[in-house]
């Protein structure tokens, strides 16, 4: 069963999705660690490209 925060909408917090919310349709901005630690422009790219994506790149 999906997390309640992902059923109707994405809930963003600084650094990515709200804690516990791992929704593929979420379009939160990458966190500082992601944007500074890898060259990916989106967390989706980070997840696919980087070997060790941070927690906001599910």
Curated annotation (Swiss-Prot):
UniProt source species: Carcinus maenas (Common shore crab)
Function of the protein: Metallothioneins have a high content of cysteine residues that bind various heavy metals. Class I MTS in marine crustacea are involved in the sequestration of elevated levels of heavy-metal ions.
Official protein name in the record: Metallothionein
Molecular functions (GO terms): metal ion binding
UniProt: a divalent metal cation 1 binding residues: 5-6, 17, 21
Binding-site residues for a divalent metal cation 3, renumbered to this chain: 12, 17, 26, 28
Family, similarity comment: Belongs to the metallothionein superfamily. Type 3 family.
Induction remarks: By cadmium.
Record-listed a divalent metal cation 5 binding positions: 34, 38, 56-57
Residue ranges of the region described as Alpha: 30-58
């Amino acid at each position: 069963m999906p997390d309640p925060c992902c059923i109707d909408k994405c809930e963003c917090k600084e650094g990515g999705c709200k804690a516990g919310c791992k929704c593929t349709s979420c379009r939160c901005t990458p966190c500082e660690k992601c944007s500074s630690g890898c060259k990916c422009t989106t967390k989706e790219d980070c997840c696919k490209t980087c070997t060790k994506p941070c927690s906001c790149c599910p």
